[in-house]
Curated annotation (Swiss-Prot):
Keywords: Hydrolase, Lipid A biosynthesis, Lipid biosynthesis, Lipid metabolism, Metal-binding, Zinc. This is UDP-3-O-acyl-N-acetylglucosamine deacetylase. Zn(2+) binds at H77, H233, D237. GO terms for biological process: lipid A biosynthetic process. The lineage of its organism: Bacteria, Pseudomonadati, Acidobacteriota, Terriglobia, Bryobacterales. Gene3D superfamilies: lpxc deacetylase, domain 1, lpxc deacetylase, domain 2. It holds the Pfam family LpxC. It comes from Solibacter usitatus (strain Ellin6076). The gene is lpxC.
């Protein structure tokens, strides 16, 4: 996309928080040029939390943001949709501490964006382009990013049977995201449920908003939406965490059994070293691609 965007009209949704189990309502509203994505806690006098890597607070089982002690949790699905569908500037009014899980995927949010419509501003979009490779590793897990003229993902996952090893590669565009990733739901294992509930997690989880596996397969009556739904959902999560860069990304991200903590570490590594990236406009990118084709 050449220009910055927002939504044309407000839209709203309601549900429960996956981990808190609390009822929550969100409204997505247009925001001015260069606002970015800003969460607005309507239950706390409109307190604002920008969706930025600077405000990452928790990265265990979900990504949470915090500013001055005020929390917004499980942000990754909604941010994934904004980032992939090309939504740069919105206010997200929310009346509790956790984004609603809805059906566990990004698809309901994609439908909300379609309902809202997209408005282009005249301000040129500025992209974050990776200039050199970097990686983060920990205990056999790894996430890397390489220079690329598109936003490209390679995602490798490995889980207990019956899921096993899965892999996925795609160029992230609104069209590819809507058809290849948005439908993939969050997931877990039946034998982990008691432990997670004892940790204060998944209080809002059900078969209506998550895939639950046993050693024999999913408990969900309708089964899986794709054989590799788990890998697709991890790619969806990854995009949501990369959205905290604050600008559309040009680079090839390779995630090998990575999770929220490693995603956050990569983002912090990028933003902590300006030599890793440059900020360019769509026109500058197009000019470079044209020159490369001619030369």
């Amino acid at each position: 996309m050449r220009f910055e965007t927002t939504v044309q009209r407000p839209v709203e949704a309601s549900g429960v928080g996956l981990h808190s189990g609390v009822p929550v309502k969100i409204r997505i509203l247009p925001a001015p040029v260069s606002t970015g994505v800003v969460f607005v806690r309507t239950d706390l006098d409109g307190f604002q939390i920008p969706a930025s890597w600077r405000h990452v607070a928790r990265v265990s089982y979900a990504t949470s943001l915090m500013r001055q002690g005020v929390l917004i949790s499980t942000t990754e699905h909604l941010l994934s949709v904004f980032y992939s569908m090309g939504i740069d500037n919105v206010y997200v009014e929310i009346d509790n501490l956790e984004v609603p899980i809805l059906d566990g995927s990004g698809l309901p949010f994609v439908k909300l964006i379609a309902q809202a419509g997209i408005r282009q501003y005249r301000r040129k979009r500025r992209y974050l382009r990776i200039r050199r490779p970097i990686s983060v590793e920990d205990k056999g897990k790894r996430i890397s990013i390489l220079p690329d003229e598109a936003f490209r993902l390679t995602c490798d996952t490995e889980y207990p049977a019956p899921v096993g090893r899965q892999s996925l590669e795609l160029v992230v565009t609104p069209e590819h995201y809507a058809s290849e990733l948005a439908f993939a739901r969050t997931f877990g294992w039946e034998n982990d449920l008691d432990q997670m509930r004892n940790m204060g997690l998944i209080r809002g989880a059900s078969l209506a908003n998550a895939v639950c596996f046993t050693s024999e397969g999913p408990l969900n009556p309708d089964g899986l939406r794709a054989v590799d739904e788990c890998c697709r959902h991890k790619a969806l999560d990854l995009i949501g965490d990369l959205a905290l860069l604050g600008r559309p990304l040009l680079g090839h991200v390779i995630a090998e059994r990575a999770g929220h903590a490693m995603h956050a570490a990569l983002v912090a590594r990028i933003m902590g070293d300006p030599s890793i990236y440059e900020i360019i406009t769509f026109d500058q990118l197009a000019s470079r691609v044209t020159q490369a084709l001619v030369s």
